């Protein structure tokens, strides 16, 4: 008997969930420079995976998702994310931590629990589709 091959979206969702779990784990660690750096790096990975998932969902529904902003707007417009979510701030903070040297790392670190919650809500809605 053949097993059902998971779709690209299912695979991306499982990777998204894995990244959420790792972000949650690192946020529960002590607040040393090492773990703060690890949390910021994990945030970057989770953000990237979020966009991959949004692009896959948008593509499968023939919806626009060319830029980060457009992907998040598509998610809001289709009820995948809350309208008041902090995605604009999240996108700006993602850009800040990816500058060399990273900008405002301590400030961004302080927002990661909120961003994790936003990612988790998005994951729950997408998984239910």
Please tell me what each predicted stretch does.
Residues 1-129:
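Solvent-exposed interaction patches of small proteins and small membrane subunits
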């Amino acid at each position: 008997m053949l097993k059902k091959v998971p779709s690209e979206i299912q695979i991306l969702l499982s990777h998204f969930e894995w990244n959420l779990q790792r972000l949650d784990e690192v946020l529960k660690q002590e607040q040393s420079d090492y773990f703060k750096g690890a949390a910021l790096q994990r945030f970057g990975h989770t953000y990237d995976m979020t966009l991959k998932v949004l692009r896959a969902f948008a593509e499968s529904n023939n919806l626009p998702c060319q830029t980060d902003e457009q992907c998040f707007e598509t998610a809001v417009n289709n009820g995948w994310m809350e309208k008041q979510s902090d995605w604009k701030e999240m996108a700006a903070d993602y850009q800040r931590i990816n500058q060399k040297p990273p900008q405002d790392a301590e400030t961004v670190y302080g927002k990661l629990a909120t961003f994790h919650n936003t990612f988790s809500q998005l994951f729950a809605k997408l998984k239910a589709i």
